[in-house]
Design a protein with these regions (language model features):
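Short, Lys/Arg-enriched N-terminal segments with co-localized hydrophobic residues
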Residues: 13-28
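Anion-binding alpha/beta catalytic cores of soluble intermediary-metabolism enzymes, centered on
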Residues: 29-77, 81-341
Length: 341
């Protein structure tokens, strides 16, 4: 008789045939979101930030506010149709009895009343609920009744990227579609100020393009060069700024070395400024869905930080967004206190 051969009734366990885990699965196996955990831990010594939660009329947005309150990051003020908010809470078995509710008839009314709470010093942050971002921002940017400042409003993602040692700020991937050079000055400065509020000791800003050399045929390289010169002349402050840089030599020391780019930013950037919204949105979503990153979103340049979350966000990303807003609000309180002295 021939040698007995074991039959295999299941999938082969060889490395070649083993199913590769997705980035999300790899991410789930990590013990914690260490970078986000550090941000949340920094908020433990800070009082919860009074936050107007705008139109939390679905389970996702209402639960996000409640979770952030449970951790001690915010004190939610729920702004929207009272009956509908209570209906959502009852259906999802969420306890909202301890939270103040400001009744509003519809989503745009919710946005207007939330902004009014800020103007009346009853709230120090805004948090987007189930209304469209344009509805919320429309109320924020109104000249007479909104929350405008001298700065242009811009958006930052604070990203927790696996394998990257520190949080990575990407701007602007959500608000400014095709920003001008003038717009980008504020976009860069907003991101720098945010990095300092988050406790970054040395802020290193990479102005991204498709290449690391100035090319007259590629407008983003010209704007990058101009922004760097503006930083040299003190028109942008608080950071090392370099560009144009391609993504690889902005975040990879090896790539920067191969390209022979000698710069304190190249290969070590912790703030990435993208040419336009499309590039930024694709970069952030690529990191999220291909590399297992999480993204905490915040809008800056208004009187108060504005928390933007997505229904697809993880619990940790939602909490991180609230932690970022709390740290920004605390930095503004400290700045105001210093100015009064």
């Amino acid at each position: 008789m021939g040698a007995f051969r074991r039959r295999s009734y299941g999938a082969s366990r060889s490395p070649q045939n083993r199913r590769r885990r997705t980035p999300r699965e790899e991410r789930a196996m990590e013990p914690s979101h260490e970078k986000y955990d550090r941000l949340i831990a920094r908020c433990k010594s800070i009082p919860p930030t009074p936050t107007a939660v705008v139109h939390p009329c679905d389970e996702s947005s209402l639960r996000g506010a409640i979770d952030a309150a449970r951790v001690g990051l915010i004190t939610p003020i729920l702004v929207g149709p009272t009956a509908r908010i209570r209906e959502v809470a009852a259906k999802a078995r969420l306890d909202i009895t301890k939270f103040r509710i400001v009744d509003a008839g519809y989503s745009q009314d919710s946005a207007a009343k939330a902004v009014e709470l800020v103007r009346n010093a009853e709230a120090e942050a805004l948090m987007k609920g189930s209304l469209h971002t344009d509805e919320l921002m429309g109320a924020v940017v109104k000249r007479e009744t909104g929350l405008r400042t001298s700065r242009r409003i811009s958006h930052c993602f604070v990203m927790d990227v696996p394998g990257h040692p520190d949080p990575l700020i990407i701007t602007d991937a959500a608000v400014n579609i095709t920003p001008s050079l003038k717009d980008k000055v504020d976009i860069v400065q907003n991101a720098i100020d945010l990095a300092h509020d988050l406790g970054t000791a040395e802020v290193r800003v990479a102005i991204l393009s498709a290449m690391e050399t100035v090319n007259p045929d590629v407008p983003s390289t010209l704007e990058a060069a101009a922004l760097c010169k503006m930083a040299d002349r003190g028109q942008i402050t608080g950071a090392l700024v370099d560009g144009p840089l391609a993504l690889d030599n902005a975040i990879s020391p090896e790539a920067a070395k191969i390209k022979k780019i000698d710069s304190p930013v190249a290969g070590r950037a912790n703030v990435l400024v993208v040419p336009d919204l499309e590039a930024g949105n694709m970069l952030a979503k690529s990191l999220t869905f291909l590399a297992g990153a999480d993204a905490a979103g915040i809008v800056l340049g208004a009187r108060v930080p504005i928390i933007l979350t997505s229904r697809a966000d993880s619990l940790t990303a939602r909490l991180a967004s609230c932690a970022v807003a709390t740290l920004v609000a605390e930095a503004r309180r400290a700045s105001t206190a210093r100015a009064v002295r």
